[in-house]
């Protein structure tokens, strides 16, 4: 047995289990891991191979005899009737029957309801009223002809499959026996993964998945490829979290039911996780609004009352494209449904964006065969730690930089607090430990902010997150690994007739457009593709061609509009809808193609012209320049009329470009082609 296993068994006897046993039985039994490990903990808490094998056989026997499979429900009911008494393992929920003034249990797999249950179980295990819990239930059967209308089934005893109590002080004491690296491995093995097969960054991501279970009102988003185990921990590992599969949900179910006056899932569970975020829809119009209110403050108003709850929110979903493509053409929150995808206020409430693409797809060798905590013990530890806070752990050693606003600070503090609860639950940490956690927290929040900048523009411009050492006063900046994704506009020379412009699209978002022009022998025809049926875009391209026909001799006597055909394709790279501000870019593209001379490399031309040649000002210059920068532009051609708006642009953004100004459309052509 390896050292860590020996250590675990020595310091946490009876609270650890060999995870390959879970795996072996799990593959054949459709029960949550925490139910399985509860039984394994009862019968297999030993390192003696023979006793362990006997224990495994015992657990298998219990599962085959007592675990209720939905298709065998009638068979089990018959057993209860014939034997008079029988023990079952099932998920039971309880409702109050106010007409009879009794509590009635509902069996999930057995399909029984209306079974009377003693009120003392309900008081002791209030989760029975909130979605139900897995229990070992001793049932009795007694049919009385006189008491018609009542169920012949009754409940003799209920044993919830969860830890009865948790001694945190003992946990703190034993934590001292393990190094940081060992403790991380123990936590990861407790969730069923094998840390020796994983890189350090992946280990940190797996720990981050646990933060919503240990921190109150924590909002986490994880989007990534399929098969990376995004929802596993919330569905299988913790009995205190609920996974809401993507699809329609209601305010009553999630928050508060006005008619029954019952609080919804956020009041019953420690974590509410939404699987497949792309499918989230609310029946109620105000659903997203209430969710935003809850994510910001931990409270929500329904009717006349304001309710508080402490459940964390987790959003997991799939990214169907590569991250590079997504960053170039859209933003990392793109998989969210349309009602949320461009709602910057909603995403600003996310405390952390976990990059699911950095976690490998799960393969058999990633699952552990070593010892880890019984899932229930781990879940109870996480639950108890919710009552504590380490959000001030930063202050002793560091200050946060001035680019972080109040929401950023709250997000970073919550992440730091959650990770310290997991790694140093006894509060025994040093400066380097805090710095490591702080850097990780800043990166995840900056990833949120970078996307907000793409969605909401200049309002979220401050993304240069940093922290300052209280002793040395050194300022350290953190960056996001995938930041280098934004080169839609490639380096090197374009082909003649190709040009980029940035403008506001039909959806209200600012996007990048590429115009490609081909000039072939012909008789003066002009064809345009890529416009679909967009009237404004068509008009602006037609304006450009009419202006080109009327004014091409001002550019060069060699241009012909009678012996050549012009073909133009317009591409909406960001997918934000076409724009009516393409006229100037189209005019320059036509001249560039006709002269067979390329536009300067990595240049974006801004502005538009009317049929008479009047230059129109660029609206929202700062936001437009931000999109230019994100798209990879190095040179900008601006109309002189926009010079008055330059003070609205942050100096550090303005300094990123070589900026040229033009007075007229002809002037713009010469400057774009680099001709003096």
Curated annotation (Swiss-Prot):
InterPro entries named among the record's database cross-references: BrxL, BrxL-like, BrxL_N, Lon_proteolytic, Lon_Prtase, P-loop_NTPase, Ribosomal_Su5_D2-typ_SF, Ribsml_uS5_D2-typ_fold_subgr
GO biological process: defense response to virus; protein catabolic process; proteolysis
This protein's UniProt keywords: Antiviral defense, Hydrolase, Protease
Pfam family, one: BrxL_ATPase
Keyword Cell division: no
GO molecular function terms noted in the UniProt entry: ATP binding; ATP-dependent peptidase activity; serine-type endopeptidase activity
Transmembrane regions: none
Keyword field contains Hydrolase: yes
Induction: Part of the pglZ-brxL operon.
Gene3D superfamilies named in the record: 3.30.230.10
Function: BREX systems (bacteriophage exclusion) provide immunity against bacteriophage. Part of a type 1 BREX system. This system allows phage adsorption but prevents phage DNA replication, without degradation of the phage DNA. Methylation of bacterial DNA by PglX probably guides self/non-self discrimination. When the brxA-brxB-brxC-pglX and pglZ-brxL operons are transformed into a susceptible B.subtilis strain (BEST7003) they confer resistance to bacteriophages SPbeta, SP16, Zeta, phi3T and SP02 and partial protection to phages SP01 and SP82G (these include lytic and temperate phage).
Family designation: Belongs to the BrxL family.
The protein, known as: Lon-like protease BrxL
Taxonomic path: Bacteria, Bacillati, Bacillota, Bacilli, Bacillales
Name of the gene this protein is made from: brxL
């Amino acid at each position: 047995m390896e050292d860590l296993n020996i250590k675990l068994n020595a310091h946490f006897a009876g609270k650890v289990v060999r995870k390959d046993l879970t795996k072996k039985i799990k593959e054949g039994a459709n029960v949550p891991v925490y139910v399985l490990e509860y039984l394994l903990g009862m019968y297999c808490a030993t390192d003696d191979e023979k006793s362990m094998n006997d224990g495994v056989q015992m657990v298998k026997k219990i599962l085959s005899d007592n675990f209720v499979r939905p298709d065998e429900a009638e068979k089990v009911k018959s057993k209860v009737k014939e034997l008079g008494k029988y023990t079952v393992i099932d998920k039971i929920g309880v409702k109050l029957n106010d007409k009879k003034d009794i509590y009635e249990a509902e069996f999930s797999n057995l399909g029984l309801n209306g079974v009377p249950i003693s009120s003392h179980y309900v008081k002791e295990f209030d989760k029975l009223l909130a979605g139900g819990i897995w229990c070992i239930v001793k049932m009795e059967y007694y049919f009385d002809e006189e008491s018609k209308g009542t169920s012949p089934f009754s409940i003799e005893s209920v044993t919830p499959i969860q830890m009865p109590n948790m001694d945190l002080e003992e946990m703190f004491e034993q934590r001292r026996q393990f190094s940081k690296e060992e403790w991380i491995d123990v936590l990861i093995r407790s969730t069923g993964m094998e840390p020796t097969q994983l890189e350090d960054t992946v280990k940190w991501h797996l720990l981050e998945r646990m933060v919503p279970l240990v921190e109150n009102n924590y909002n986490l988003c994880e989007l990534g490829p399929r098969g990376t185990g995004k929802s596993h921990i919330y569905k299988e590992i913790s009995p205190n979290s609920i996974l809401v599969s993507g699809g329609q949900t209601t305010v009553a179910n999630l928050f508060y039911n006005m008619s029954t006056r019952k609080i919804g899932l956020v009041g019953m569970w420690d974590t509410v996780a939404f699987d497949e975020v792309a499918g989230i829809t609310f029946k109620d119009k105000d659903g997203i609004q209430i969710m935003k209110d809850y994510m910001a403050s931990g409270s929500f108003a329904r009717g006349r009352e304001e309710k508080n709850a402490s459940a964390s929110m987790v959003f997991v979903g799939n990214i169907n494209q590569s991250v590079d493509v997504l960053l170039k053409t859209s933003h990392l929150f793109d998989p969210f449904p349309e009602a949320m995808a461009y709602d910057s206020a909603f995403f600003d409430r996310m405390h952390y964006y976990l990059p699911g693409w950095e976690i490998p797809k799960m393969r058999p060798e990633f699952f552990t065969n070593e010892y880890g905590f019984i899932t229930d013990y781990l879940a109870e530890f996480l639950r108890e730690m919710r009552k504590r806070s380490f959000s001030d752990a930063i202050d002793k050693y560091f200050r946060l930089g001035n680019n972080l606003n109040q929401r950023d600070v709250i997000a970073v503090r919550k992440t730091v607090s959650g990770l310290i609860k997991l790694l140093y639950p006894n509060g025994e940490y040093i400066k380097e430990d805090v710095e490591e956690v702080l850097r990780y927290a800043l990166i995840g929040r900056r990833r949120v902010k970078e996307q907000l900048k793409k969605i909401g523009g200049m309002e979220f411009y401050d993304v240069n997150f940093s922290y300052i050492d209280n002793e040395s006063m050194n300022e350290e900046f953190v960056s996001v690994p995938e930041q280098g994704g934004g080169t839609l506009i490639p380096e090197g020379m374009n082909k003649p007739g190709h040009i980029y412009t940035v403008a506001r699209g039909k959806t209200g978002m600012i996007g990048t457009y590429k115009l490609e022009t081909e000039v072939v022998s012909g008789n003066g025809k002009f064809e345009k593709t890529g416009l679909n049926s967009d009237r404004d875009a068509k008009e602006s391209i037609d304006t450009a061609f009419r202006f080109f026909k009327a004014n091409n001799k001002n550019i060069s006597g060699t241009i012909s509009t009678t012996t050549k055909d012009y073909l133009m394709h317009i591409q909406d790279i960001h997918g934000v809808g076409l724009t009516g501000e393409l006229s100037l870019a189209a005019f320059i593209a036509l001249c560039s193609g006709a002269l067979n001379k390329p536009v300067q490399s990595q240049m974006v031309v801004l502005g538009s012209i009317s049929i008479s040649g009047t230059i129109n000002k660029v609206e929202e210059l700062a936001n437009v320049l931000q999109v230019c920068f994100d798209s990879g532009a190095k040179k900008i051609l601006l109309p002189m009329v926009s010079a008055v708006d330059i003070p609205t642009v942050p100096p550090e953004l303005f300094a990123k470009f070589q900026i040229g100004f033009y007075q007229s459309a002809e002037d713009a052509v010469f400057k774009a082609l680099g001709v003096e």
